[in-house]
């Protein structure tokens, strides 16, 4: 007999669900743990259709995993959020969140209420962020461009392009500085999305290059067109310039065969008139996302205009933004009249088709509204080029964040070790139950230097103990304050001054990863009940016929 409330599913409550959630989070963290740090290893992921991805990027690994457990999904989304918000630190944010959960579960087993733990974690996170901002940040104005290059090198050190760190770091910094513009509030902005990254497999990765201007992976639509135009006026069209045909279903009854020729002529004339309206404004470069008819190409060749077809929508948007053009999906106004004005054109100093590496590319140089830059990556194969692109994206985001926040923190586990010592001392000053949670938060942060050392095949216990001793000395003894920059040297297996060595990370990466990891851990920690509904069975009659409903007594006849 069913109770007054029957749930069509499984219900898991209390300690059991909390343990399940912690195990799910720990298993996700274990997948990405070995890819952390400059000597982290790569993962090979093969999807259901056999596509192979080789990567070291935490967000990419977790995006490609098909995770079923709801708590594990929270961590996968967490890595994605960190990637979108900051661009780097995706692996460490997942590892910290899982460790916070694991330690919280231990406290719950000791009969500490989850609410007390949540309060302690929130307090510890707030205190940690305050400590970073007051004691650990280094102003980039003191260090200049070298600081940006070092931050980019630190980001790349764990990636495939880390071997040529100096070469790529300079390229990344130059690319980000090239797209700088000032917004309406007078603040400098660095839109990383406007840097076009093209991949061409072949040659070595050292033969990658930075181009000042927007590189378009297309060629001119006809051989008769000019390959170079100075003082370009660019029209960006989101429709095809092909002979207009009547829509399907339109029937025209013709009594005179000559009328058929007139209809065909009119179809051709509609497109011809559109082209004439565009060319009349002085446009000499036409970019369209659709196709261009051979008949239409003739008009462009005659007027010595460059026309490019099948341009990607993404590229068209970026070019329009850089050149000041307006993207048009139709020439018709609300009244139905077709027109094209000169104000809709974008401007650039030069548009030229060049052979770069082994491919023909169209370069749009010195655009009027904003500057643009393109990076062409070379690599042994497609897997390598894809991973280089992901590594480059992380480095570009890091440089952008350093320029915007104007501050960096030392890398190599220095921040986590300093926070661990500080929060342990802070916990002892608390007279409430939150003391235990803050102490566990401090212990959880040590997972980062620990994992870095393990991945580098070093003695993690010994290294982390030495690191903590240095940071304790820095906080206790004001005369030895400079020891707070001490982090790990993973190649030689000893602590070193990471400020002098130039191992830097953007402050935002550390602050955001702490905040995101704490919030994710709290979200999962608050769960004490899981109700998983059964999928509706096929022989379920609830969606049956009228006769079935009458027969079951659900409705009266």
UniProtKB/Swiss-Prot annotation:
Organism expressing this protein natively: Monodelphis domestica (Gray short-tailed opossum)
The protein's name in its UniProt record: T-complex protein 1 subunit alpha
Positions of post-translational Phosphoserine modification: 6, 552
Compositionally biased residues, Basic and acidic residues: 538-550
Coiled-coil blocks: none
Compartments reported by the entry: Cytoplasm, Cytosol; Cytoplasm, Cytoskeleton, Microtubule organizing center, Centrosome
Top-rank taxon, per record: Eukaryota
Start and end residues of each stretch annotated as Disordered: 538-557
PTM-bearing positions, type Phosphotyrosine: 181
Main location: cytoplasm
Modification N6-acetyllysine, positions: 199, 400, 494
EC number: 3.6.1.-
InterPro entries, per the entry: Chap_CCT_alpha, Chaperone_TCP-1, Chaperonin_TCP-1_CS, Cpn60/GroEL/TCP-1, GroEL-like_apical_dom_sf, GROEL-like_equatorial_sf, TCP-1-like_intermed_sf, TCP-1_chaperonin
């Amino acid at each position: 007999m069913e109770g007054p409330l029957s749930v069509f599913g499984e219900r898991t409550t209390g300690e059991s669900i909390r343990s399940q959630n912690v195990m799910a989070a720990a298993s996700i963290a274990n997948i990405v743990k070995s890819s952390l740090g400059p000597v982290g290893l790569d993962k090979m992921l093969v999807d259901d259709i056999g596509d192979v991805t080789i990567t070291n990027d935490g967000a990419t690994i977790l995006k490609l995993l098909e995770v079923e457990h709801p708590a594990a999904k929270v961590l996968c989304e967490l890595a994605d959020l960190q990637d979108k918000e900051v661009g780097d630190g995706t692996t460490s944010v997942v590892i910290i969140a899982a460790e916070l959960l694991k330690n919280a579960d231990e406290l719950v087993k000791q009969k500490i209420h989850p609410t007390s733990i949540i309060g302690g974690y929130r307090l510890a996170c707030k205190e940690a962020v305050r400590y970073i901002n007051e004691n650990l940040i280094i102003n980039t104005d003191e260090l200049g461009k070298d600081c940006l290059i070092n931050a980019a090198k630190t980001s790349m050190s764990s990636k495939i392009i880390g071997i040529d760190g100096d070469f790529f770091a300079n390229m990344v910094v130059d690319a980000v500085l090239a797209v700088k513009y000032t917004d309406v509030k007078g603040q400098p902005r660095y839109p990383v999305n406007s840097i076009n990254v093209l991949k061409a497999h072949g040659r070595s990765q050292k033969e990658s290059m930075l181009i000042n201007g927007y590189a378009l992976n297309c060629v001119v639509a006809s051989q008769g067109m000019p390959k170079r135009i100075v003082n370009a006026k660019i029209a960006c069209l989101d429709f095809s310039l092909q002979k207009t045909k009547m829509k399907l279903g339109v029937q025209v009854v013709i009594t005179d065969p000559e009328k058929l020729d007139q209809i065909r002529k009119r179809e051709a004339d509609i497109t011809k008139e559109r082209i004439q309206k565009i060319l009349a404004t002085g446009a000499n470069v036409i970019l369209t996302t659709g196709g261009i008819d051979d008949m239409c190409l003739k008009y462009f060749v005659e007027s010595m205009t460059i026309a490019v077809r099948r341009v990607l929508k993404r590229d068209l948007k970026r070019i329009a933004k850089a050149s000041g053009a307006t993207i048009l999906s139709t020439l018709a106004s609300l009244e139905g009249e077709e027109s094209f004005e000169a104000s809709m054109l974008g401007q650039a100093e030069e548009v030229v088709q060049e052979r770069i590496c082994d491919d023909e590319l169209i370069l749009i140089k010195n655009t009027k509204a904003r500057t643009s830059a393109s990076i062409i990556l070379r690599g042994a194969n497609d897997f390598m080029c894809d991973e280089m692109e992901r590594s480059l994206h992380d480095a570009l985001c890091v440089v952008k964040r350093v320029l915007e926040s104007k501050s960096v923190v030392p890398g190599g586990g220095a921040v986590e070790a300093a926070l661990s010592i500080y929060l342990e001392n802070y916990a002892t000053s608390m007279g409430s139950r939150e003391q235990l949670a803050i102490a566990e938060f401090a212990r959880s942060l040590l997972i980062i230097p620990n994992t870095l050392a393990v991945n580098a095949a070093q003695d993690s216990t010994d290294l982390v103990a030495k690191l903590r001793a240095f940071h304790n000395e820095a906080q206790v003894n004001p005369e030895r304050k400079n020891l707070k920059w001490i982090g790990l040297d993973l190649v030689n297996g000893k602590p070193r001054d990471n400020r002098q060595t130039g191992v830097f990370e953007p402050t935002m990466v550390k602050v955001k990863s702490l905040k995101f990891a704490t919030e994710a851990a709290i979200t999962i920690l608050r769960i004490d009940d899981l109700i998983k509904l059964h999928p509706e069975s096929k022989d379920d009659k609830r969606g049956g016929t009228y006769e079935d409903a009458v027969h079951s007594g659900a409705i009266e006849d």
